[in-house]
A protein has these predicted regions:
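C-terminal motif of bacterial Sec signal peptides marking the signal peptidase cleavage site
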Residues: 14-17
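An extracytoplasmic/periplasmic, membrane-proximal ligand-sensing/linker region
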Residues: 35, 46-56, 60-71, 311, ...
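Extracytoplasmic small-molecule ligand-binding "clamshell" domains
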Residues: 45-113
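Short helix-initiation/N-cap motifs at beta->coil->alpha
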Residues: 86-97, 210, 215, 246-264, ...
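A ligand-binding cleft/hinge motif common to bilobed small-molecule-binding domains
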Residues: 108-122, 238-242, 267-268, 272-293
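Short beta-strand->loop
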Residues: 125-135, 250-252, 285-303
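A conserved helix-loop-strand patch within extracytoplasmic ligand-binding domains
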Residues: 130-232, 238-243
Length: 372
Protein backbone atom coordinates (compact mmCIF):
# COMPACT_ATOMS: atom_id res chain seq x y z
CA UNK A 1 0.00 0.00 0.00
CA UNK A 2 1.41 3.43 0.78
CA UNK A 3 4.22 2.39 3.10
CA UNK A 4 2.54 4.44 5.83
CA UNK A 5 4.41 2.77 8.63
CA UNK A 6 7.84 3.23 7.04
CA UNK A 7 7.20 6.92 6.47
CA UNK A 8 6.22 7.36 10.11
CA UNK A 9 9.26 5.40 11.21
CA UNK A 10 11.66 7.51 9.13
CA UNK A 11 10.08 10.73 10.39
CA UNK A 12 10.33 9.54 13.98
CA UNK A 13 13.99 8.61 13.53
CA UNK A 14 14.69 12.00 11.97
CA UNK A 15 13.02 13.74 14.89
CA UNK A 16 15.06 11.76 17.38
CA UNK A 17 18.28 12.55 15.49
CA UNK A 18 17.51 16.26 15.31
CA UNK A 19 16.61 16.62 18.97
CA UNK A 20 12.96 17.48 18.27
CA UNK A 21 11.98 14.00 19.26
CA UNK A 22 8.45 12.66 19.40
CA UNK A 23 9.47 11.08 22.70
CA UNK A 24 11.21 12.33 25.77
CA UNK A 25 14.97 12.00 25.45
CA UNK A 26 16.09 9.55 28.07
CA UNK A 27 19.54 8.32 28.94
CA UNK A 28 20.32 4.94 27.38
CA UNK A 29 20.59 2.25 30.05
CA UNK A 30 24.18 1.37 30.81
CA UNK A 31 25.98 -1.95 30.54
CA UNK A 32 23.28 -3.78 28.56
CA UNK A 33 26.02 -5.96 27.04
CA UNK A 34 26.46 -7.57 30.46
CA UNK A 35 22.83 -8.64 30.74
CA UNK A 36 23.37 -12.18 29.39
CA UNK A 37 26.28 -13.92 31.14
CA UNK A 38 25.52 -17.62 31.09
CA UNK A 39 28.31 -18.73 33.43
CA UNK A 40 27.85 -15.97 35.99
CA UNK A 41 25.58 -16.35 39.01
CA UNK A 42 22.15 -14.74 38.69
CA UNK A 43 22.46 -11.00 39.04
CA UNK A 44 20.00 -8.76 40.78
CA UNK A 45 18.11 -6.10 38.90
CA UNK A 46 20.00 -3.36 40.70
CA UNK A 47 23.34 -4.80 39.55
CA UNK A 48 22.25 -4.89 35.91
CA UNK A 49 20.53 -1.53 35.31
CA UNK A 50 20.04 1.65 37.26
CA UNK A 51 16.75 2.68 35.63
CA UNK A 52 13.91 1.20 33.56
CA UNK A 53 11.95 3.41 31.15
CA UNK A 54 8.33 2.43 30.42
CA UNK A 55 6.72 4.00 27.35
CA UNK A 56 3.03 4.62 26.71
CA UNK A 57 1.02 5.97 23.79
CA UNK A 58 -1.59 8.62 24.66
CA UNK A 59 -5.15 7.51 25.26
CA UNK A 60 -5.90 10.82 26.97
CA UNK A 61 -4.16 14.12 27.67
CA UNK A 62 -0.45 13.49 28.25
CA UNK A 63 -0.35 15.12 31.68
CA UNK A 64 -3.36 13.12 32.86
CA UNK A 65 -1.90 9.88 31.51
CA UNK A 66 1.39 10.50 33.33
CA UNK A 67 -0.54 11.07 36.56
CA UNK A 68 -2.53 7.87 36.03
CA UNK A 69 0.49 5.65 35.42
CA UNK A 70 2.64 7.02 38.27
CA UNK A 71 1.28 4.62 40.94
CA UNK A 72 2.14 1.71 38.64
CA UNK A 73 5.64 3.10 38.09
CA UNK A 74 6.08 3.40 41.86
CA UNK A 75 5.04 -0.23 42.37
CA UNK A 76 7.45 -1.39 39.68
CA UNK A 77 10.25 0.64 41.28
CA UNK A 78 9.59 -0.93 44.67
CA UNK A 79 9.34 -4.43 43.26
CA UNK A 80 12.38 -4.22 40.98
CA UNK A 81 14.54 -2.27 43.38
CA UNK A 82 15.44 0.41 40.82
CA UNK A 83 13.89 3.58 39.42
CA UNK A 84 11.13 3.07 36.84
CA UNK A 85 10.27 6.13 34.77
CA UNK A 86 7.08 6.42 32.74
CA UNK A 87 6.93 8.58 29.64
CA UNK A 88 4.39 9.23 26.88
CA UNK A 89 5.21 9.24 23.17
CA UNK A 90 3.21 11.09 20.53
CA UNK A 91 2.28 7.87 18.69
CA UNK A 92 3.24 4.22 18.19
CA UNK A 93 6.08 5.01 15.78
CA UNK A 94 7.64 7.16 18.50
CA UNK A 95 7.40 4.30 21.00
CA UNK A 96 8.83 1.89 18.42
CA UNK A 97 11.87 4.11 17.82
CA UNK A 98 12.37 4.70 21.55
CA UNK A 99 12.53 0.98 22.29
CA UNK A 100 14.39 0.06 19.11
CA UNK A 101 17.10 2.62 19.85
CA UNK A 102 17.43 1.67 23.52
CA UNK A 103 15.76 4.80 24.90
CA UNK A 104 12.96 2.75 26.45
CA UNK A 105 12.92 -0.72 27.97
CA UNK A 106 9.22 -1.52 28.26
CA UNK A 107 6.26 -0.39 26.16
CA UNK A 108 2.49 -0.78 25.89
CA UNK A 109 1.74 -1.53 22.23
CA UNK A 110 -1.41 -1.97 20.18
CA UNK A 111 -1.39 -5.22 18.21
CA UNK A 112 -0.35 -3.81 14.84
CA UNK A 113 2.19 -1.51 16.48
CA UNK A 114 3.84 -4.50 18.15
CA UNK A 115 3.94 -6.56 14.94
CA UNK A 116 5.46 -3.72 12.91
CA UNK A 117 7.94 -3.06 15.71
CA UNK A 118 8.99 -6.71 15.62
CA UNK A 119 9.53 -6.46 11.88
CA UNK A 120 11.55 -3.24 12.12
CA UNK A 121 13.69 -4.53 15.00
CA UNK A 122 13.29 -8.34 14.89
CA UNK A 123 15.72 -9.07 17.73
CA UNK A 124 14.91 -6.16 20.05
CA UNK A 125 11.35 -6.86 21.20
CA UNK A 126 9.52 -9.55 23.16
CA UNK A 127 5.88 -9.50 24.27
CA UNK A 128 5.54 -10.67 27.87
CA UNK A 129 1.87 -9.88 28.48
CA UNK A 130 -1.36 -9.52 26.56
CA UNK A 131 -4.25 -7.45 27.84
CA UNK A 132 -7.68 -8.84 28.63
CA UNK A 133 -10.84 -6.80 28.27
CA UNK A 134 -13.84 -8.05 30.23
CA UNK A 135 -12.70 -11.66 30.06
CA UNK A 136 -11.51 -11.69 26.44
CA UNK A 137 -7.92 -11.66 25.22
CA UNK A 138 -8.98 -10.76 21.70
CA UNK A 139 -11.52 -8.71 19.76
CA UNK A 140 -12.86 -8.62 16.22
CA UNK A 141 -14.06 -6.29 13.52
CA UNK A 142 -17.80 -6.16 12.83
CA UNK A 143 -19.47 -5.68 9.46
CA UNK A 144 -22.44 -3.28 9.58
CA UNK A 145 -25.31 -2.47 7.26
CA UNK A 146 -28.33 -0.18 7.20
CA UNK A 147 -30.08 -2.39 4.63
CA UNK A 148 -32.04 -5.15 6.37
CA UNK A 149 -32.97 -6.65 3.00
CA UNK A 150 -29.54 -8.34 2.81
CA UNK A 151 -30.33 -10.39 5.93
CA UNK A 152 -31.17 -14.07 5.63
CA UNK A 153 -33.86 -13.54 8.28
CA UNK A 154 -35.36 -10.68 10.26
CA UNK A 155 -32.75 -8.87 12.41
CA UNK A 156 -32.90 -9.71 16.11
CA UNK A 157 -31.44 -8.32 19.31
CA UNK A 158 -28.06 -9.98 19.33
CA UNK A 159 -24.36 -9.87 18.51
CA UNK A 160 -21.71 -12.03 16.90
CA UNK A 161 -19.01 -13.99 18.68
CA UNK A 162 -16.31 -16.32 17.35
CA UNK A 163 -17.14 -19.56 19.17
CA UNK A 164 -14.52 -22.26 18.57
CA UNK A 165 -13.43 -20.26 15.55
CA UNK A 166 -16.92 -20.08 14.04
CA UNK A 167 -18.75 -16.72 13.75
CA UNK A 168 -21.97 -17.28 15.68
CA UNK A 169 -25.00 -15.04 16.18
CA UNK A 170 -25.78 -14.91 19.90
CA UNK A 171 -29.25 -13.59 20.62
CA UNK A 172 -30.52 -11.50 23.50
CA UNK A 173 -33.83 -9.88 24.35
CA UNK A 174 -35.24 -6.58 25.56
CA UNK A 175 -34.32 -7.61 29.10
CA UNK A 176 -31.18 -9.71 28.58
CA UNK A 177 -28.00 -8.67 26.80
CA UNK A 178 -26.49 -11.18 24.34
CA UNK A 179 -23.80 -13.19 26.13
CA UNK A 180 -20.74 -11.93 24.26
CA UNK A 181 -17.43 -10.40 25.32
CA UNK A 182 -17.88 -6.91 23.86
CA UNK A 183 -20.28 -4.54 25.61
CA UNK A 184 -23.14 -3.96 23.17
CA UNK A 185 -25.10 -0.79 22.49
CA UNK A 186 -28.26 -0.52 24.57
CA UNK A 187 -26.75 -2.01 27.72
CA UNK A 188 -25.06 -0.61 30.80
CA UNK A 189 -23.74 -1.87 34.10
CA UNK A 190 -26.16 -2.21 37.00
CA UNK A 191 -25.86 -3.63 40.50
CA UNK A 192 -26.70 -7.12 39.26
CA UNK A 193 -24.97 -7.07 35.89
CA UNK A 194 -25.95 -5.64 32.53
CA UNK A 195 -29.24 -3.78 32.33
CA UNK A 196 -31.04 -1.84 29.57
CA UNK A 197 -29.47 1.60 29.23
CA UNK A 198 -31.63 4.65 29.87
CA UNK A 199 -30.11 8.10 29.41
CA UNK A 200 -32.04 11.23 30.41
CA UNK A 201 -35.26 9.26 30.35
CA UNK A 202 -34.61 7.88 26.85
CA UNK A 203 -34.03 4.15 26.40
CA UNK A 204 -31.12 3.32 24.12
CA UNK A 205 -32.20 0.78 21.51
CA UNK A 206 -30.46 -2.59 21.94
CA UNK A 207 -28.30 -3.52 18.99
CA UNK A 208 -29.76 -5.60 16.17
CA UNK A 209 -27.92 -8.30 14.23
CA UNK A 210 -28.63 -10.70 11.40
CA UNK A 211 -26.75 -13.26 9.33
CA UNK A 212 -25.71 -12.30 5.79
CA UNK A 213 -22.94 -13.18 3.37
CA UNK A 214 -20.05 -10.73 3.31
CA UNK A 215 -20.10 -11.05 -0.48
CA UNK A 216 -23.12 -8.71 -0.52
CA UNK A 217 -20.65 -5.80 -0.36
CA UNK A 218 -19.30 -6.62 -3.85
CA UNK A 219 -19.66 -3.56 -6.06
CA UNK A 220 -20.84 -1.45 -3.12
CA UNK A 221 -19.41 1.50 -1.24
CA UNK A 222 -17.85 0.37 2.05
CA UNK A 223 -16.83 2.67 4.89
CA UNK A 224 -13.54 1.69 6.55
CA UNK A 225 -11.77 3.45 9.42
CA UNK A 226 -8.28 4.13 8.03
CA UNK A 227 -5.61 2.12 6.25
CA UNK A 228 -3.72 1.45 9.50
CA UNK A 229 -6.74 0.20 11.47
CA UNK A 230 -6.54 -3.52 12.26
CA UNK A 231 -10.25 -4.12 12.91
CA UNK A 232 -11.45 -1.25 10.74
CA UNK A 233 -9.54 -2.12 7.56
CA UNK A 234 -6.70 -4.68 7.56
CA UNK A 235 -8.63 -7.72 8.84
CA UNK A 236 -11.85 -7.11 6.88
CA UNK A 237 -9.94 -6.29 3.68
CA UNK A 238 -7.87 -9.47 4.09
CA UNK A 239 -11.14 -11.31 4.68
CA UNK A 240 -12.42 -10.03 1.32
CA UNK A 241 -9.20 -11.06 -0.41
CA UNK A 242 -9.41 -14.58 1.00
CA UNK A 243 -12.98 -14.78 -0.34
CA UNK A 244 -11.79 -13.81 -3.81
CA UNK A 245 -13.14 -10.26 -3.63
CA UNK A 246 -10.79 -7.46 -4.71
CA UNK A 247 -10.76 -5.07 -1.74
CA UNK A 248 -9.71 -2.17 -3.99
CA UNK A 249 -11.56 -2.68 -7.27
CA UNK A 250 -14.27 -5.15 -6.24
CA UNK A 251 -15.79 -2.59 -3.88
CA UNK A 252 -15.61 1.18 -3.51
CA UNK A 253 -13.58 1.71 -0.32
CA UNK A 254 -13.94 4.96 1.62
CA UNK A 255 -12.11 5.94 4.79
CA UNK A 256 -14.03 7.74 7.52
CA UNK A 257 -10.94 8.37 9.66
CA UNK A 258 -12.33 6.89 12.87
CA UNK A 259 -14.59 4.13 14.15
CA UNK A 260 -17.27 6.58 15.24
CA UNK A 261 -16.95 8.26 11.83
CA UNK A 262 -17.91 4.99 10.15
CA UNK A 263 -20.96 4.56 12.38
CA UNK A 264 -22.01 8.18 11.87
CA UNK A 265 -21.60 7.82 8.10
CA UNK A 266 -23.80 4.74 8.06
CA UNK A 267 -26.40 6.32 10.32
CA UNK A 268 -26.53 9.43 8.12
CA UNK A 269 -26.89 7.41 4.92
CA UNK A 270 -23.46 8.07 3.40
CA UNK A 271 -23.11 4.35 2.65
CA UNK A 272 -24.94 1.17 3.56
CA UNK A 273 -21.93 -0.96 4.51
CA UNK A 274 -19.08 -0.38 6.93
CA UNK A 275 -16.78 -2.08 9.40
CA UNK A 276 -15.38 -1.14 12.84
CA UNK A 277 -14.51 -2.77 16.14
CA UNK A 278 -17.37 -4.34 18.09
CA UNK A 279 -19.50 -2.47 19.27
CA UNK A 280 -18.64 0.98 17.90
CA UNK A 281 -22.33 1.89 17.71
CA UNK A 282 -21.98 2.85 21.37
CA UNK A 283 -20.01 5.94 20.29
CA UNK A 284 -23.18 7.43 18.75
CA UNK A 285 -25.74 6.36 21.34
CA UNK A 286 -25.69 9.58 23.38
CA UNK A 287 -26.96 11.65 20.47
CA UNK A 288 -28.78 8.93 18.50
CA UNK A 289 -30.50 6.49 20.84
CA UNK A 290 -31.83 4.43 17.91
CA UNK A 291 -28.40 3.72 16.37
CA UNK A 292 -28.59 0.09 17.48
CA UNK A 293 -31.66 -0.59 15.36
CA UNK A 294 -30.60 1.47 12.33
CA UNK A 295 -27.03 0.10 12.06
CA UNK A 296 -27.19 -3.71 11.98
CA UNK A 297 -24.34 -6.19 12.54
CA UNK A 298 -24.24 -8.94 9.89
CA UNK A 299 -20.77 -10.57 10.10
CA UNK A 300 -17.44 -10.40 11.92
CA UNK A 301 -13.74 -10.90 11.21
CA UNK A 302 -11.32 -13.38 12.74
CA UNK A 303 -10.18 -12.63 16.27
CA UNK A 304 -7.45 -10.02 16.76
CA UNK A 305 -5.12 -10.33 19.76
CA UNK A 306 -5.44 -7.52 22.30
CA UNK A 307 -2.70 -4.98 23.10
CA UNK A 308 0.57 -6.20 24.55
CA UNK A 309 3.29 -5.14 26.95
CA UNK A 310 6.64 -5.66 25.25
CA UNK A 311 10.15 -5.54 26.68
CA UNK A 312 13.63 -5.38 25.23
CA UNK A 313 14.86 -8.93 24.67
CA UNK A 314 18.22 -8.21 26.32
CA UNK A 315 16.67 -7.49 29.71
CA UNK A 316 17.47 -10.16 32.31
CA UNK A 317 14.96 -13.01 32.40
CA UNK A 318 14.31 -12.49 36.11
CA UNK A 319 13.46 -8.85 35.41
CA UNK A 320 11.01 -9.76 32.64
CA UNK A 321 9.22 -12.16 34.96
CA UNK A 322 9.14 -9.63 37.81
CA UNK A 323 7.71 -6.95 35.52
CA UNK A 324 4.95 -9.32 34.44
CA UNK A 325 4.20 -10.47 37.99
CA UNK A 326 4.04 -6.94 39.39
CA UNK A 327 1.76 -5.68 36.61
CA UNK A 328 -0.53 -8.72 36.78
CA UNK A 329 -0.85 -8.36 40.56
CA UNK A 330 -1.45 -4.60 40.22
CA UNK A 331 -4.30 -4.92 37.72
CA UNK A 332 -5.89 -7.51 40.03
CA UNK A 333 -6.35 -4.80 42.69
CA UNK A 334 -9.28 -2.37 42.71
CA UNK A 335 -6.93 0.59 42.22
CA UNK A 336 -5.00 -1.07 39.41
CA UNK A 337 -8.14 -2.22 37.63
CA UNK A 338 -9.67 1.26 37.79
CA UNK A 339 -6.54 2.92 36.39
CA UNK A 340 -5.83 0.40 33.61
CA UNK A 341 -9.49 0.30 32.60
CA UNK A 342 -9.48 4.09 32.36
CA UNK A 343 -6.23 4.24 30.38
CA UNK A 344 -6.69 1.40 27.88
CA UNK A 345 -9.79 -0.55 28.87
CA UNK A 346 -7.65 -3.39 30.28
CA UNK A 347 -9.20 -5.56 32.98
CA UNK A 348 -6.56 -8.31 33.28
CA UNK A 349 -3.21 -9.51 31.93
CA UNK A 350 -2.18 -12.95 30.64
CA UNK A 351 1.11 -14.20 29.18
CA UNK A 352 1.52 -13.38 25.47
CA UNK A 353 1.83 -16.21 22.92
CA UNK A 354 3.80 -15.23 19.83
CA UNK A 355 1.84 -17.45 17.40
CA UNK A 356 -1.35 -15.48 18.14
CA UNK A 357 0.05 -12.62 16.07
CA UNK A 358 0.56 -14.64 12.86
CA UNK A 359 -2.67 -13.41 11.25
CA UNK A 360 -1.70 -9.82 12.04
CA UNK A 361 1.66 -10.43 10.37
CA UNK A 362 -0.14 -11.84 7.33
CA UNK A 363 -2.27 -8.71 7.10
CA UNK A 364 0.77 -6.44 7.48
CA UNK A 365 2.55 -8.28 4.67
CA UNK A 366 -0.51 -8.18 2.41
CA UNK A 367 -0.86 -4.43 2.79
CA UNK A 368 2.79 -3.61 2.23
CA UNK A 369 3.61 -2.48 5.75
CA UNK A 370 6.86 -4.43 5.50
CA UNK A 371 7.89 -3.10 2.08
CA UNK A 372 11.44 -1.77 1.67
Amino acid sequence: MKKTFLILLCLSMLLVACGGSAVETVEEPAATEEVETLDAPATTVAETLDKIVFGFVPSAEQAQLLDNIQPMMDLLSDGLGIEVEGFVTSDYSGLLVAMGSGQADVGAFATLGYVTAMNAFPTRFEAIAKSVRYGSGSYHGTWWTTDASICKSTPVIGAFENINGVPTLVTGSTTASPDVAALQVGWGFGDDGLIPEVRDGVTTSPGLACEADISVVTGEEVLFVEEGSTSGYLYPALQLKNMGIDYVNGITPRFAGSHDGVIAGLYNGDAKFGVTYDDARRTLRKTNADVGEKVIAFAITDEIPNDVIAVRTDLPEDMKQKIYDILAEYIATDEGLAIMDEIYGWTDLVPAVNSEFDVVREAAEEFGLYDD
